[in-house]
Amino acid sequence: MGDWGFLSALLDKVQSHSTVIGKIWMSVLFIFRILVLGAGAENVWGDERSNLVCNTNTPGCDNLCYDWQFPISHIRFWVMQIIFISTPTLVYLGHVVHIIHQENKQRELLKSNPMAKSPKYTDENGKVEIKGSMLGSYLTQLFIKIILEVAFIVGQYYLFGFIIDHKFICERSPCMRAECFVSRPTEKSIFIIFMLVVACVSLALNVLEIFYLLCRRISRRSKKCRQAMYNGESRYPGHFTTELESMNGMRHNEFNVAFQNKWSQRKGSLDAAKPEA
C-alpha cells in the first residue's frame, strides 16, 4: 500500500473541492479499489503464472499459453485503470490550485486597493465554489472519467471476459490444442466480478453527479430570474398595474367609439327613411 500513498494524498485534497457525490466516488475509489487491490489482489493472483499447468511436454508452452490467454495481468490492468481514471481528477485539482493561487493574489491586492476585482470562485477560507469555468472544468473531467470507465470495462471483457474457466485450450504454435489448467478459478472469478461491480458503481456515480450539477445550475438560474423579477416589481410597484389599467381603458374607449359610429349609422338611415313615408 505504500506505493499508493502519493496518489491517495493527492486525491484526498480533491475531496474538499468536490460535491457530495464526488466525495462518495472518492471513497469508493479509496476503499473498494485501491485498498482491496493492494490488500487482496496479490493473494488471489500471485500464483496465476506459477500454478498454470499445461498437459504438454513441449518446453516453454506454459509461458506461451499463459501469454496467449492473458495478454496482460489482471492486477496490472486494474492498476492502469485506477491511474487513468484518477488522472482527470488530478488535472482538475491542478486547475483548482491555480484558481486559489490567483484569487489569493486578488484578495491581497483588494486590501491595498478597494477598487480591485473581488475573488469570484473562493471565499476567505479558500473553499472553491463550483461555477463558471470551474463548473466547466469539473464537468469535463467527469465526462472523461465516464469515457475511460466504459473503455476499461469493454476492454476487460474483450481481453479476459468476466469469468475464468478452470481450463482453456491453447491455440498458439507450437502448443496447439494443449489443455491448460488455471489455479483457483472460482476465487479469481469472484474477484473479477467484484472489481467490475465497483467500476459500474463508479460509472453510475459520475453520471449521477453530472445530472446533479446540471440540475443545480438550472435551479440557480431560475432562482436568479425570479429574484430579478421580484426586484423589478418592488422597485416599480405600480408599473404593471398602471399598464394593465391603461390597456383596459384603451379597449373601453375603442368599444365606445365603435358603438357610437354604429348608432350614428342607424340613426341616419332612420332619418332618411321618414320623408319617404
Curated annotation (Swiss-Prot):
Membrane topology, Extracellular segments: 41-76, 165-189
GO molecular function, one term: gap junction channel activity
Record's keyword annotation contains Phosphoprotein: no
Spans traversing the lipid bilayer: 20-40, 77-97, 144-164, 190-210
Disulfide bridge partners, by residue number: 54-175, 170-180
Assigned keywords, A-Z: Cell junction, Cell membrane, Disulfide bond, Gap junction, Membrane, Transmembrane, Transmembrane helix
Lineage: Eukaryota, Metazoa, Chordata, Craniata, Vertebrata
Topological domain ranges for the Cytoplasmic compartment: 2-19, 98-143, 211-277
Complex formation: A connexon is composed of a hexamer of connexins.
Function: One gap junction consists of a cluster of closely packed pairs of transmembrane channels, the connexons, through which materials of low MW diffuse from one cell to a neighboring cell.
Name of the molecule in the record: Gap junction Cx32.2 protein
GO biological process, one term: cell-cell signaling
InterPro entries, per the entry: Connexin, Connexin_CCC, Connexin_CS, Connexin_N, Connexin_N_sf
Entry's Gene Ontology cellular component terms: connexin complex
Family per similarity comment: Belongs to the connexin family. Alpha-type (group II) subfamily.
Membrane topology term: Multi-pass membrane protein
The species this protein was found in: Danio rerio (Zebrafish)
Pfam family, one: Connexin
